[in-house]
């Protein structure tokens, strides 16, 4: 059975000292779900964009990266609102899940 490839993505907020460890944990959670992390994708911001999680320019860079790698799934470090997930899925043309959904898949 072929593994699904994903991009693990997160926003590093200024006050987050454990960001690298959190991203490693996200990758481990993905692997526990049988996913293959093709790449990590990050952005440093003072706070997450309330509409789209990433800034608009960085979101378009993520879209380009998905196309280059032929990856159709993104997992996010932080819990997102349904509106953020919809905006990202519409912009990226990819399935987007947050950390909480990933954990629920492990225990399903």
Regions found by a protein language model. Give the residues of each.
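N-terminal accessory targeting/assembly segments
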Residues: 1-105
């Amino acid at each position: 059975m072929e593994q699904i490839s994903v991009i693990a993505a997160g926003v590093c907020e200024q006050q987050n000292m454990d960001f690298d460890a959190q991203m490693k944990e996200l990758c481990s959670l993905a692997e526990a779900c049988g996913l293959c992390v093709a790449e990590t994708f990050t952005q440093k911001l003072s706070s997450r964009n309330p509409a789209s999680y990433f800034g608009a320019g960085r979101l378009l860079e993520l879209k380009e990266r998905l196309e280059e790698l032929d990856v159709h799934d993104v997992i996010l470090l932080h819990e997102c609102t349904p509106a953020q997930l919809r905006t990202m899925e519409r912009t990226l043309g990819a399935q987007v899940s947050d950390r909480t959904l990933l954990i629920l898949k492990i225990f399903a």
